[in-house]
């Protein structure tokens, strides 16, 4: 298996962050549901986005990909749809994209025709129990292989009341919010318990609004009222920069050298924008300069982070916390055990190989700061965020960090190693016998 050796050293410089994967998924799905031709600019063809584009084609849309004339090195995608779901390819490969699967399951049920969803890697065993329990009572025949993919679906989704726990992936709620407005009657979604990852649900509602779809909800997002018989209109939009991916470079700026990031929306609805508050609370200096975010190191101090609203930030934040004097705590992150890897175990295992002092508990991590990391061979766990976190850690290592499974970044951020090099990263691919 090939691995990547990263030589230690201070990193600094300027990058143009890649577009938001979360927003791109939502724009692409809304374009499928809208009548006419929608143009979505500033797209990077990560594996996850390829999966969602392929699903749109399977459900009746045509997809054309061109080079962007506005965003250098990026793509513009033109999605033409009749605004109605029709199954033209009965098997949809979701790759390893949980977002694709959780959005497509309810959206595909806007028609009665049978469809089968397949996946790869860990996605095959990731839980879809929420839909498995909800949909059979709403007109959908749902089958799987002992709780695993492939998932078979047949029948048209019915309007009505949907009750969902707030501590599950918000993608289940977003998927229903995308489908229910197109049914013949009104629906409601009731959330039991506090809604985690609330910003992602608000992003879904905002994206639907751009296509002419309205969703009413209570202030605490415990109740959503969805009028039926709505129609989505095609439109042209550009994807804003990705705060989830920028988080790794915000941490890099906090622990290594000054990093400048272009392409971010300061007022974004993306929940992971909270990374700025987190690195500032750790002692980093941040400033906006003519639309560019600049992060530089300060005197680091330990923190306590509630990850219930920003679970994707945990791998990056853990790297910074491992270098903060004293004890840091990351809590309410139990859903990370069901991601592309068990991220709590992965972070604990791999950072400890680099000399960190990380303890894992049921829903989080307790981290005792060290002065620096040590060189070692580490495993990326076939998880893009684990690989990127380990790469950032190398900037404060006393020896080379060698990552196996480094290719996992293609899932969400195929430009990552290019941007890492722009900041001075010295990387060398190794081939094992």
Residues covered by each model-derived region:
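Short, structured segments at the rim of ligand-binding sites
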Residues: 1-433
């Amino acid at each position: 298996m090939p691995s990547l050796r990263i030589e230690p050293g201070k990193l600094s410089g300027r990058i143009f962050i890649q577009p938001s994967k979360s927003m791109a998924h939502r724009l692409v799905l809304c374009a499928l549901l809208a009548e006419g031709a929608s143009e979505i600019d500033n797209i990077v063809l990560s594996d996850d986005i390829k999966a969602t584009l392929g699903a749109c084609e399977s459900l009746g849309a045509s997809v054309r990909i061109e080079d962007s004339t506005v965003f250098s090195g990026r793509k513009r995608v033109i999605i033409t749809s009749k605004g109605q779901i029709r199954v033209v390819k009965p098997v949809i490969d979701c790759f390893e994209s949980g977002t694709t699967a959780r959005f497509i399951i309810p959206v595909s049920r806007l028609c009665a025709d049978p469809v089968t969803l397949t996946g790869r890697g860990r996605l095959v065993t990731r839980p879809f129990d929420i839909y498995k329990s909800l949909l059979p009572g709403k007109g959908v025949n749902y089958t799987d292989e002992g709780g695993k993919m492939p998932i078979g679906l047949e029948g048209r989704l019915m309007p009505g009341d949907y009750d969902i726990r707030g501590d599950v992936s918000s993608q289940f709620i977003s998927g229903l919010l995308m489908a229910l407005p197109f049914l013949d009657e009104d629906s409601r979604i009731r959330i039991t318990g506090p809604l985690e990852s609330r910003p992602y649900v608000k992003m879904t509602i905002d994206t639907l609004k751009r296509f002419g779809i309205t969703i009413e909800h209570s202030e605490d997002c415990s109740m959503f009222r969805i009028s039926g018989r709505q129609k989505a209109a095609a439109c042209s939009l550009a994807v804003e920069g990705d705060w989830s991916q920028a988080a790794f470079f915000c941490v890099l700026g906090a622990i290594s050298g000054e990093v400048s990031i272009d392409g971010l929306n300061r007022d974004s609805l993306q929940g992971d924008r909270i990374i700025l508050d987190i690195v500032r609370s750790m002692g980093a200096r941040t400033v906006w300069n003519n639309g560019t975010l600049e992060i530089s190191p300060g005197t680091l101090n330990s923190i306590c982070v509630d990850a219930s609203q920003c679970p994707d930030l945990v791998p990056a934040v853990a790297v910074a916390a491992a270098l903060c004097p004293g004890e840091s705590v990351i809590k309410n992150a139990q859903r990370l055990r069901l991601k592309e890897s068990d991220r709590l175990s992965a972070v604990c295992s791999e950072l400890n190989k680099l000399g960190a002092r990380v303890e894992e508990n049921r829903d989080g991590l307790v981290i005792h700061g060290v002065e620096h990391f040590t060189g070692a061979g580490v495993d990326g766990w076939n998880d893009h965020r684990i690989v990127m976190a380990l790469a950032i850690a190398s900037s404060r290592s006393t020896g080379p960090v060698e990552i196996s499974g480094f290719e996992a970044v293609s899932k969400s951020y195929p430009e990552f190693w290019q941007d890492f090099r722009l900041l001075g990263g010295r990387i060398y691919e190794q081939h094992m016998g």
